[in-house]
Amino acid sequence: MTIAITGATGHLGGEIIEELLRLGTSSNSIVPVIRNKAKAATFARRGMSPRIASYEDHGALRNAFDGAREMVLISSPVLNNAIRVQQLHNAVTAAHSVGVKHLIYIGLAAPEKQAFGLEEVELATEYLIRALGVPFTFIRNGVYFDELRSELEIAAKTGVLPSATGNQPLNWALRRDMACAVAAVLHQKGHEWKTYELTAAQAFTYDDLATALSQTTGRRVTHHQTDPASAVRALTDSGMPSEHASTIVEDFQTPIAHRKFTDHNDALTDFTGRPTDPATSIRTLFR
């Protein structure tokens, strides 16, 4: 069994590879697909067979995927939808043309809620895979709990967790757990033609985060609910770079306030056997 994995130098791709190796997958059956040739040696030293291709180069993608029975396609990080849709079209049609037997496509959870404005491309890619008849598993990842790290670090120091979330629920879970779920899909049988939404088993609020952080650190942390401009100012006043603070509030906290991340289910915990509550996730994130 040969497995091609795109985005292998990224956080998710790398964690999928590590979990596959932990599960006993032979390193010589893993084909990391990477853009930067300079990073190939890192994989080759571990017995893997890296191949060089970018999402823009259909021919290189064909060569990279050739001989792979299974493939993990991690959605493009590019935010321009016109570019993303072409990149993903290239990857899917390349996989189809070389006879990939099982395509695991990793996109965004709850695409119908349009949390980021990227979801139409995710859905178009799923429809393309269906139209070509490639056996698939669609993994729709929720937002990574890891995105909260900088906010939680500041709150642990200051005792205040500022947000413009309206204390609405969110369903974020650890990237590590999502990588484990993808590896399980590859390692087990019976996941073809299925769609999995990977989120926390129960949604939680910033109040819950503050409580969990208090329990974890031993320092009382309170959630301070405020407006977006004040949330950005509070984060920057605590030492966060202003651009990063604006991204957190505009791209993440505002969608939370608009209830874009409320759906939840047990699929992730069924794959990993691990809890997804805030306290557990915080301990894992900072250990």
PLM regions: where:
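Amphipathic terminal alpha-helices
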Residues: A267-R287
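Terminal hydrophobic/aromatic helix or amphipathic segment near a protein terminus
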Residues: A212-H258
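Glycine-rich Rossmann NAD(P)(H)-binding loop
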Residues: A164-Q168, Y196-A203, G218, Q225, ...
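Glycine-/Pro-rich loop/turn segments that contact NAD(P) or position catalytic residues
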Residues: I74-T158
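Substrate-positioning beta->alpha
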Residues: A164-A184, K194, T205
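Glycine/proline-rich active-site loop of Rossmann-fold NAD(P)-dependent oxidoreductases
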Residues: L148-I154, V185-T195, F261-T262
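NAD(P)H-binding glycine-rich loop region in Rossmannoid oxidoreductase-like domains
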Residues: P32-S97
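N-terminal Rossmann NAD(P)H-binding glycine-rich loop of SDR-like oxidoreductase domains
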Residues: T2-T25
